[in-house]
From Swiss-Prot:
Keywords: ANK repeat, DNA-binding, Metal-binding, Phosphoprotein, Repeat, Zinc, Zinc-finger. It comes from Arabidopsis thaliana (Mouse-ear cress). GO terms for molecular function: DNA binding; DNA-binding transcription factor activity; zinc ion binding. This is Zinc finger CCCH domain-containing protein 30. Residues 583-594 have a biased composition (Low complexity).
Length: 716
């Protein structure tokens, strides 16, 4: 134990060392000789401080009985400086020394037998006994503090550095429980540590870095120390730095910065470009190290649920976590932003409020997810439904590749995760029907009588939609892969440089062009050694009409195919799968097709509409059945004989000689027929074509159809 006394034995020698005599009492004894002068001093106060440090109760009692006033005296004590590891000489009382080393018995003796001042401050640091007990690091410091508090110690007294006893607590590293108990005992207002500003002093190497001032001192001052001597602050005092008014900062409550789009996708997401110090709370952009930083919900797929690991301090997954990090990511998430009403209503004074202030500002909630973002699965089903309905007016991608959100982030996989919320809902009353024109096997007999007379209007609307959608589809086919067989053909047609809008129109309305394209397409398939399933090219049968009724107009079917220019290996393999599924129905479809073709021929003998013309379907449908509105599906024996002769495919060419005898062309009619077949647009623009011209065009289409049927039968 290191100690020192406040009164030292001083020996004055004039020339040489002489023997020194010590007296038993405390008086100064001077022996004077003619040649020598000796001064001897002795002090027992140093022994009292040492006795107090060693918890020697009997020695302290004897010293107090000998001189009761020595209890309140202060003497030099060599020990560790408070708040550091440096050893210095400073003035201490016996009670301070006993409190520093945890001498419980000596403290009880001093406070019980004498009138010692437990709140006395001395030394250069103006410390008290309670400061010494808190900073001494004794194992039994809790009992010492309780004794001093019971004796009347004031825990609000400040030392020379403006610190209370609770601000200078030092305990061994393994005694964290003692530290917490001391914090509870020495709290200024009796509350817990988490509810007040509390500093814990750590050991520092020198005095220059030790001063630490309380942030809430009685004098209202505050201090700071060096990084080595700065204490650990359990709760920081709220303090906002004042910045000069910056007119260049945008107003986050007005203009574009207050819109839902900016708040959800850009607020505290985009980095700030200002290189000078400014108020981050007034800036809508993110800064390095800012706690309000958000991940872009269009690039990082996370929910609005708070991350439990992030609440504890850090999330090991970082930006790849599927949960929200922080309040801003949670409440500014598109699934939760402004889905609830603010309790303050229109009187809300928050700079950035996460809630809606009026019912009109509420964002819609989706029943499938309970949030403001549609379900990813429901959107996938919606996209699949659109791909199955090529004629749907909404048959576009769920989120256009040209949208600002898709172009801004440069990531295609985020388009399905964050679709636009204004996509209309899809209602499919006939969802049990297969809408693909190559697979449906609907018959005209299945159509009710009251709907049969409306088929012409449906087909006219279908053809008009088909032409208009073909013009607008070329822009999106580049970025959207074909989803089915019909998309494959339409993609090839829209990407072909040799077809313009007029060519697409002629492909829709010209039977001659369709026949030529179909023949060329069959030749390419033969080169790939594959077989194409029978494609219905019957322009007069009700089957071509009921497709337009149930599948809707919009995309070009394989009957309207333009010339493909890309390699057909991948496409033919896909078509071969369709062929396997249709081979079982091939014979039945051919017979039904031939039957309807024969019925159409007999019908044209009496009334001569143009076969397959979209503009004259009213005439065709009105003359199909009897006058009472009921369709007449009967046929004569003569027609059956002609059917047998025309259905024989033993020869190289079909027997169509009886058709040649029905019509004799005049030179004028031949010219009109050539003009009609050369341009599909010319036929479309004639609301009431001349009857002979219509008849020739229909016969030509029927002949081409029969040739195609024969080619298909030969391949089978």
């Amino acid at each position: 134990m290191c100690c020192g006394s406040d009164r030292l034995n001083q020996i004055v020698s004039s020339r040489s060392s002489l023997p020194i005599s010590f007296e038993e009492d405390n008086n100064l004894v001077t022996n004077t000789d003619m040649n020598h002068l000796t001064v001897e001093t002795e002090d027992t106060f140093a022994s009292l401080l040492e006795l107090a440090a060693n918890n020697d109760v009997e020695g302290v009692r004897l010293s107090i009985e000998r001189d009761p006033s020595c209890v309140d005296e202060a003497g030099l004590w060599y020990g560790r400086q408070k708040g550091s590891k440096a050893m210095v000489n400073d003035y201490r009382t016996p009670l301070m020394v006993a409190a520093t080393y945890g001498s419980i018995d000596v403290i009880k003796l001093i406070v019980s037998l004498t009138d010692a001042d437990v709140n006395r401050a001395c030394g250069n640091d103006q410390t008290t006994a309670l400061h010494c007990a808190a900073s001494g690091g004794a194992v039994n410091a809790i009992q010492v503090v309780k004794l001093l508090l019971a004796a009347g110690a004031d825990l609000n007294l400040l030392d020379a550095e403006g610190q209370r006893a609770g601000d200078v607590i030092v305990v061994p590293p393994k005694l964290e429980g003692v530290k917490l108990m001391l914090q509870e005992l020495l709290s200024a207002d009796g509350s817990s540590t988490a509810e007040r500003n509390l500093r814990v002093v750590t050991n520092v190497p020198n005095r220059s870095s030790s001063p630490c001032h309380s942030p809430t001192g009685e004098n209202g001052g505050s201090g700071s120390g060096s990084p080595l001597g700065s204490p650990f602050k359990l709760k920081s005092t709220e303090f906002k730095k004042e910045y000069p008014v910056d007119p260049s900062l945008p107003d986050i409550k007005n203009s574009i910065y207050a819109t839902d789009e900016f708040r959800m996708y850009s607020f505290k997401v985009r980095p700030c470009s200002r290189a000078y110090s400014h108020d981050w709370t007034e800036c809508p952009f993110v800064h390095p190290g800012e706690n309000a930083r958000r991940r872009d919900p269009r690039k990082f797929h996370y929910s609005c649920v708070p991350c439990p690991d992030f609440r504890k301090g850090a999330c090991r997954r970082g930006d790849m976590c599927e949960y929200a990090h922080g309040v801003f990511e949670c409440w500014l998430h598109p699934a939760q932003y402004r889905t609830r009403l603010c309790k303050d209503g229109t009187g809300c004074a928050r700079r950035v409020c996460f809630f809606a202030h009026t019912p009109e500002e509420l964002r819609p909630l989706y029943a499938s997810t309970g949030s403001a973002v549609p379900s990813p699965r429901s959107n996938a089903d919606y996209a699949a439904a659109l791909s199955l309905l090529p004629g749907s007016p909404s048959g576009v991608s769920v989120m256009s590749p040209l949208s600002p959100s898709a172009a801004g982030n440069g990531m295609s996989h985020s388009n399905m995760a964050w679709p636009q919320p204004n996509v209309p809902a899809l209602h499919l009353p006939g969802s049990n029907l297969q809408s693909s024109r190559l697979r449906s096997s609907l018959n005209a007999r299945d159509i009710p009588t009251d709907e049969f007379n409306m088929l012409a209007d449906y087909e006219q609307q279908q053809l008009l939609n088909e032409y208009s959608n073909a013009l607008s589809r070329s822009g999106r086919m580049k970025s959207m892969p074909p989803s089915n067989l019909e998309d494959l053909f339409s993609a090839e047609g829209s990407s072909s440089p040799r077809f313009t809008d007029s060519a697409l129109a002629s492909a829709v309305f010209s039977p001659t062009h369709k026949s030529a394209v179909f023949n060329q397409f069959q030749q390419q398939q033969q080169q790939q050694q594959s077989m194409l399933s029978p494609i219905n090219t019957s322009f007069s049968s009700p089957k071509s009409v009921d497709h337009s009724l149930f599948s809707g107009g919009g995309r070009m079917s394989p009957r309207n195919v333009v010339e493909p220019i890309s390699p057909m290996s991948a496409r033919v393999s896909m078509l071969a799968q369709c062929v396997k599924q249709q081979q079982q129905q091939q014979q039945q479809q051919q017979q039904q097709h031939q039957f309807r073709s024969l019925s159409s021929r007999e019908l044209r003998t009496n009334s001569s509409p143009i076969v397959g013309s979209p503009v004259n379907n009213n005439t065709w449908s009105s003359k199909w059945g009897s006058s009472n509105g009921q369709p007449d599906w009967g046929m004569s024996s003569e027609a059956l004989g002609k059917l047998r002769s025309s259905s024989s495919f033993d020869g190289d060419e079909p027997d169509v000689s009886w058709v040649q005898s029905l019509v004799k062309e005049t030179p004028a009619e031949a010219k009109e027929k050539a003009a009609t077949s050369s341009s599909g647009e010319h036929v479309m623009k004639q609301p009431n074509p001349v009857e002979p011209v219509m008849d020739h065009a229909g016969l030509e289409a029927w002949i081409e159809q029969m040739q195609l049927d024969q080619l298909v039968a030969q391949q089978n």
